[in-house]
Amino acid sequence: MRKVMAAKLHGIHVTAADLDYHGSITLDPDHCEKAGLLPLEFVDIWNKNSGARISTYVIFGERYSRCCILNGAAARTCQVGDEIIICSSHYIEAERIADFQPKILTFDKGNHIVETLSYVVERDGTGRYHFDIVNEGGQSLPIPVKAHGR
């Protein structure tokens, strides 16, 4: 089994931090469902402003609120307005990598979804892997992809 990236909210902004809550990150269920994140799923969080890296679990907040709230100890790692990356991972058999297409959502400063991307891995007849980033229209994007919404 290999640990692979399963879903990512890239460039979402922290809307609140609640030190007195007992842990987790509260997210808009609409964002989570579009990316494939489940309630109680463990995620890694990377703060683009400070470089802090933490892990916690997802809880759903109010639908369509565009919330991104760090709770409990996680609240110490992010400030309101910080741009973060939230990433989940799954374990899969290496042979299944070509069947697996994680979703990546990118955001503007108001936490509106700017783009929905997919990571696509294919294996050719010689056994070599090929990686592509594809937008909703099926168009391949250059690698690395520059984040939009800035």
Swiss-Prot record:
Localization, UniProt: Cytoplasm
An example Gene Ontology molecular-function term: aspartate 1-decarboxylase activity
Class of enzymatic activity (EC top level): lyase
Cellular component GO terms, alphabetical: cytosol
Active-site residues from the entry: 24 (schiff-base intermediate with substrate), 57 (proton donor)
Keyword field: Autocatalytic cleavage, Cytoplasm, Decarboxylase, Lyase, Pantothenate biosynthesis, Pyruvate, Schiff base, Zymogen
Cofactor(s), by name: pyruvate
Main location: cytoplasm
PTM remark: Is synthesized initially as an inactive proenzyme, which is activated by self-cleavage at a specific serine bond to produce a beta-subunit with a hydroxyl group at its C-terminus and an alpha-subunit with a pyruvoyl group at its N-terminus.
Pfam families from the UniProt entry: Asp_decarbox
Catalytic reactions on record: L-aspartate + H(+) = beta-alanine + CO2
Binding-site positions, substrate: 56, 72-74
GO terms under biological process: alanine biosynthetic process; pantothenate biosynthetic process
Pyruvic acid (Ser): modified positions: 24
Similarity field: Belongs to the PanD family.
Protein name (database record): Aspartate 1-decarboxylase
Organism: Beijerinckia indica subsp. indica (strain ATCC 9039 / DSM 1715 / NCIMB 8712)
